[in-house]
């Protein structure tokens, strides 16, 4: 239910809610991919970590290019995880 009275404002409210839900879904999916990399690192399996990282990198870069997250945040995620993967034997 919206507080808008004007037709265009009602439409914008509907569009905003739709967009908010889509963005929340995309953000959740991105976080899941990041968690998969952390889980792979925790097991100590370098090959699995690298595979998970490549998948995560694609998703994070796509979200950054679409403006869902800032490009620097994407870079921070990737740098932090690649450093941890390099520490694995």
From Swiss-Prot:
GO terms for cellular component: cytosol; small ribosomal subunit. The keyword RNA-binding applies. Keywords: Ribonucleoprotein, Ribosomal protein, RNA-binding, rRNA-binding. GO terms for molecular function: small ribosomal subunit rRNA binding; structural constituent of ribosome. Residues 1-28 are annotated as: Disordered. Binds directly to 16S ribosomal RNA. This is Small ribosomal subunit protein bS20. The lineage of its organism: Bacteria, Pseudomonadati, Pseudomonadota, Gammaproteobacteria, Pasteurellales. The gene is rpsT.
